[in-house]
Amino acid sequence: MKKSIKLTLALSACALLGIGATVWAATAAKGHITIPDGYSELVFNDEFDNTGAPDSTKWGFEQGYLRNGELQYYMPGNANVNCADGVLTIEARNDSVSVDGKIIPITSASIITRPAFTWKYGYVEVRAKIPSSLGTWPAIWMMPAENVYGRWPRSGEIDIMEHVGYDPSKIHFSAHTERFNHTRGTQRTHVIEAPEAVGQFHTYGLKCTPDRLTWLYDGKEQYTIDREENSDWTSWPFDIDYYLIINLAFGGGWGGSQGVDINSLPQRYEIDYVRIFK
């Protein structure tokens, strides 16, 4: 699809920017991207202007049955992912494929920026069109590049956007830490009513600073968490590098808590762009 990109700041496609231990070349194939107020550099982006599999220099794949009792098997490569017309599409299917001699009833995909790109502070924005049927669970989220403070939830998790198909008008923003997480019922979560989100493109953003996390929907701030005075890693582990995950789950402890409609598959989750600024 054609993207609306304003000409405001020339960004060289050859300019190399070091982020943590990662060196990255930010590009803007369709034009020059607006730099948000308070930021000076585009340090990672994908406009998905290629055809076929996503750029392997930017994205990796999770594989297998991974978490939350979900029904889908995450496939590697471009089996359930495709780039065309400036959009990346993740498709959850009821296709009964064979993997290592076993029949997998439901497949989907989860793409990640690790190891290509990790970062600590800045602004991440994803423009996406989410699907909705009984069982769908699309998400945009961040996990630690290294478990500096220990395994989940000790090193944190930031959910930029989550949506479950049985409650289609709501978008969820969350952060999980050792002190504040869903297993304790103490997670920091905010829910907005956004009935227009399903089937239309909208932007989902997160601003990360040393002392604050701020979630945005269509460029408007929706939720903020501030670091408590004298807090330690148990409540604020967000001073380490994270990577980005974009996935479409089906079923599981939350997505399938009201049942699933397997006959609704395939379902498609479309990503117009991913941009990260410093």
Annotated model-derived regions:
Residues 10-20:
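Bacterial N-terminal signal peptides
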Residues 24-278:
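GH16 jelly-roll
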Residues 2-10:
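Bacterial N-terminal signal peptides that target proteins for export
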